[in-house]
């Protein structure tokens, strides 16, 4: 089955074609980073308008690059949530309308399920079950994944997400948007041992996270030291955040008796996190899997893939063929999803 995937939950417009028999056929992405940079963060109304401008040209692009035809589509998948309501509606409206016109089923995909399954797009996907670290600007969760749609929440952030902490710390250090990558580049030139920062909840005995205290500690440090030691502060923050993510993730693997760990989401592109998890995972007998760097951030490929897995169910396809509802879910718990029948 050839599935078109549409991602428009925040500040990236992504479109992709996934063939159940051939794999990923084509994908295209437009990032709004340059547009939002002047505002220091995502402006929802601007994001929605830009999705409207980009979504059709990107759709044409993936069909032209792949040589596939609209008539070959077996289904359409779009991000239904969580995310910005207006941005989500752009992709949902496009997906439902196209599916209705072609008389094929459409399915709303959970954004985090797309991230969680993105490493499975590779040539060497992890086998089930595995523990997944979902780590992005809006979410930080540890999940036990038994199969597609069978997710057990092990722990999550109690306040700020890891990616949010990276971005806010970057703002404190006078860096641009998006802050996470800029902070990591600055940290590479710093001394992580220069300043001692807390590792919140590292030894709490559970799998929950908290990054607000770490962010506050950085604020206190910046007020005391100024920005003359910005590289060292960035390095100390990154080391502290990575320590917590690595420690909690491997503890969750031990708890679940899982020897496979999947890392997904934008923070999964962080080089220090990848280096530490791979090294310490290896010592613990845990194989660590990552999506390719281009699929760490939001993209249409992960939505097309996740949609294809769910549309593989004949019953699901029949049920969705006449479904015209394109309501979105700005808030949507991943653990509430049902399994693929």
Swiss-Prot record:
InterPro entries in alphabetical order: ATPase_NBD (IPR043129), Gcp-like_dom (IPR000905), KAE1/TsaD (IPR017861), Peptidase_M22_CS (IPR017860), TsaD (IPR022450)
Protein name: tRNA N6-adenosine threonylcarbamoyltransferase
Compartments reported by the entry: Cytoplasm
Gene Ontology MF term list: iron ion binding; N(6)-L-threonylcarbamoyladenine synthase activity
Coiled coil ranges: none
HAMAP family associated with the record: TsaD (MF_01445)
Binding site for Fe cation: 111, 115, 298
NCBIfam families linked to this entry: gcp_kae1 (TIGR00329), T6A_TsaD_YgjD (TIGR03723)
Amino acids binding substrate: 134-138, 167, 180, 270
Cofactors that this protein relies on: Fe(2+)
The reaction(s) this protein catalyses: L-threonylcarbamoyladenylate + adenosine(37) in tRNA = N(6)-L-threonylcarbamoyladenosine(37) in tRNA + AMP + H(+)
Membrane-spanning residues: none
Example GO biological process: tRNA threonylcarbamoyladenosine modification
Gene3D superfamilies, per database record: 3.30.420.40
Natural source organism: Thiobacillus denitrificans (strain ATCC 25259 / T1)
Alphabetical list of SUPFAM superfamilies matching this protein: Actin-like ATPase domain
Cofactor note as given: Binds 1 Fe(2+) ion per subunit.
A GO-annotated cellular component: cytoplasm
Function per UniProt: Required for the formation of a threonylcarbamoyl group on adenosine at position 37 (t(6)A37) in tRNAs that read codons beginning with adenine. Is involved in the transfer of the threonylcarbamoyl moiety of threonylcarbamoyl-AMP (TC-AMP) to the N6 group of A37, together with TsaE and TsaB. TsaD likely plays a direct catalytic role in this reaction.
Recorded family membership: Belongs to the KAE1 / TsaD family.
Pfam families listed in its UniProt record: TsaD
Top enzyme class: transferase
Enzyme Commission code(s) on record: 2.3.1.234
Keywords: Acyltransferase, Cytoplasm, Iron, Metal-binding, Transferase, tRNA processing
């Amino acid at each position: 089955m050839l599935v078109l995937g549409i991602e428009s939950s925040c500040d990236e417009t992504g479109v992709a074609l996934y063939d159940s028999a051939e794999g990923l056929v084509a994908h295209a992405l437009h990032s709004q980073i340059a547009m939002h940079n002047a505002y220091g963060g995502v402006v929802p109304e601007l994001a929605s308008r830009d999705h409207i401008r980009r979504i059709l040209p990107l759709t044409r692009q993936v069909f032209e690059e792949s040589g596939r035809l609209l008539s070959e589509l077996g289904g359409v998948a779009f991000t239904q949530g969580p995310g910005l309501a207006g941005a989500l509606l752009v992709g949902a409206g496009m997906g439902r309308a196209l599916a209705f016109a072609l008389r094929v089923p459409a399915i709303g995909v959970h954004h985090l399920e797309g991230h969680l399954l993105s490493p499975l797009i590779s040539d060497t996907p992890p086998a089930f079950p595995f523990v997944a670290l979902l780590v992005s600007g809006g979410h930080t969760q540890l999940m036990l994944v038994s199969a597609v749609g069978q997710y057990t929440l092990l722990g999550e952030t109690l306040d700020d997400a890891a990616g949010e902490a990276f971005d806010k710390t970057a703002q404190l250090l006078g860096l641009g948007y998006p802050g996470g990558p800029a902070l990591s580049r600055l940290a590479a030139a710093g001394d992580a041992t220069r300043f001692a920062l807390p590792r919140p909840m590292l030894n709490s005995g559970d799998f929950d996270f908290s990054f607000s205290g770490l962010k506050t500690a950085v604020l206190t440090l910046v007020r005391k030291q100024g920005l003359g030691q910005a590289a060292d502060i960035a390095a100390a923050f990154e080391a502290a955040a990575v320590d917590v993510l690595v420690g909690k993730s491997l503890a969750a693997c031990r708890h679940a008796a899982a020897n496979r760990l999947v890392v997904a989401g934008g923070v999964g592109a962080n080089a220090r996190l990848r280096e530490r998890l791979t090294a310490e995972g290896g010592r613990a007998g845990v194989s660590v899997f990552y999506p390719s760097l281009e699929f760490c951030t939001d993209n249409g490929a992960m939505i097309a893939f996740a949609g294809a897995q769910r549309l593989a169910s004949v019953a699901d396809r029949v049920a969705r063929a006449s479904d015209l509802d394109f309501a979105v879910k700005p808030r949507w718990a991943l653990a509430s999803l049902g399994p693929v029948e």
